[in-house]
């Protein structure tokens, strides 16, 4: 009998949601995703110390300004960790733009190009990189511009249907709708504390987005993210991609049995509606209290961890 991780791989591209190289070697995912929190965690791993030292040495050569050195070193560290991961996976690494730029399209584009340049200078072509941006209106506009210039993007912190629709309409390469954080909100804000996988609000959200994309012929890849349990993952089997943390990859690899396809679409392609404009986007997004709160909360948390990373680098400079 096969294990559930192996069975899941037949239906869905499995991505590792970690910056931990040991986990990459163990689970051999197709792609990997990182974010400021994961980079901060990875930076605590002793084997990564040389990557930090190298990033700091490089940053010192780029500028005499201490403030600029901190920014440069944190960019270079994220790329250095990405380069190590790319040695272990056949596909793509997702590297995130500073969350503090989430409401600034112009600076998000500039930061994305900076990260791409660092990868290119290390010999990595654009087709192995995804630039992660928060799914704000400004982040989506930045992604739209980057996609036109041949830089594929992964739109993250996606909680509302309006965000998903706007991403598809912008021609974004991939979205990361968050499953577990949606569940967290409903547990905290409703009387119901337990949800079966098929009634999990995060699972329902991703299922609706997946079906809408397929029904309207959008090429944007749907990659479910932020899982709280393996039941959520199995309920989304068949989704284009799923990015899974090492603890849940381990759980799936140790569970025996075939995984049943839950998502798929073989129907006719429907006409697409007119794209949302900015006013419509904000109106629809803000009708969803969960999405409004979780997007702001997610940006704050990533910004805090980016600040912690920069403080760590500052102490070493």
Curated annotation (Swiss-Prot):
Signal peptide: none annotated. This is Transaldolase. Pathway: Carbohydrate degradation; pentose phosphate pathway; D-glyceraldehyde 3-phosphate and beta-D-fructose 6-phosphate from D-ribose 5-phosphate and D-xylulose 5-phosphate (non-oxidative stage): step 2/3. Keywords: Cytoplasm, Pentose shunt, Schiff base, Transferase. Its main location: cytoplasm. It catalyses: D-sedoheptulose 7-phosphate + D-glyceraldehyde 3-phosphate = D-erythrose 4-phosphate + beta-D-fructose 6-phosphate. InterPro entries: Aldolase_TIM (IPR013785), TAL/FSA (IPR001585), Transaldolase_1 (IPR004730), Transaldolase_AS (IPR018225). One of its GO terms (biological process) is carbohydrate metabolic process. One of its GO terms (molecular function) is transaldolase activity. It comes from Photorhabdus laumondii subsp. laumondii (strain DSM 15139 / CIP 105565 / TT01). Homodimer. It is found in: Cytoplasm. Belongs to the transaldolase family. Type 1 subfamily. The active site is at 132 (schiff-base intermediate with substrate). Its EC number is 2.2.1.2. Transaldolase is important for the balance of metabolites in the pentose-phosphate pathway. It holds the Pfam family TAL_FSA.
